[in-house]
């Protein structure tokens, strides 16, 4: 089955992944042939097609082929009604336009309701990692992370996600600007000035 979109998800078995690696390696060798790279006779490149295919399936794009993180949500027994914030979560992804990396950090937050669900902080990291490991644009990554947090934190009063990243497609080609791109997705209470400002203050405190 093909992914409908580059940043989609179709979980594969280990056997299917190995078949994909072999198939992708064969095609990447042809890609290098088209670029007139004599990779078969270069000791530094002779295994490059297999290395690249393995890296994409098992690391760079593993979010396309693995099951999502198992997340257990707990009842908010203490009726905590403040913000839950986790910032500076590493983002290692790559754009679906040029297949070049973009690297940065994600800041996430949600406000549980007194009768809603809460999750462990490590689960926010796992959500970011799961969606980062696939080809996409930063805007979509921001929305995917937001929507997953919104689903698992049932009854929440609001979710906020911000991503700050440097894109290699801008740094090494074209205008070659070492600029930082910021994207955000806010919902619920974070649409209001005070919670939104508190979130931004938490992000600013990390600088």
Question: Which sequence ranges carry the predicted segments?
Answer:
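A domain-level signal for the structural core that forms small-molecule/cofactor-binding pockets
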Residues: 1-207
């Amino acid at each position: 089955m093909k992914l409908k979109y580059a940043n989609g998800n179709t979980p594969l078995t280990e056997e299917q992944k190995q078949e994909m690696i072999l198939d992708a390696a064969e095609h990447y060798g042809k890609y290098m042939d088209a670029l007139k790279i004599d990779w078969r006779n270069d000791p530094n490149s002779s295994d490059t097609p297999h290395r690249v295919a393995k890296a994409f399936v098992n690391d760079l794009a593993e979010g396309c082929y693995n099951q999502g993180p198992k997340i257990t949500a707990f009842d908010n027994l203490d009726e905590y009604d403040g913000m839950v914030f986790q910032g500076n979560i590493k983002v290692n992804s790559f754009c679906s336009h040029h297949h070049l990396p973009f690297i940065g950090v994600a800041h996430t937050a949600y406000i549980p309701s007194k009768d809603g669900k809460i999750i462990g902080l490590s689960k926010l990291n796992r959500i970011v990692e799961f969606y980062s490991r696939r080809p996409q644009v930063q805007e979509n990554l921001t929305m995917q992370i937001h929507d997953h947090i919104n689903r698992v934190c049932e009854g929440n009063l609001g979710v906020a996600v911000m991503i700050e990243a440097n894109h290699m497609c801008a740094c090494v080609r074209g205008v070659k600007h070492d600029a930082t791109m910021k994207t955000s997705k806010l919902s619920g209470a974070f649409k209001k000035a005070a919670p939104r400002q508190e979130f931004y203050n938490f992000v600013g405190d990390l600088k």
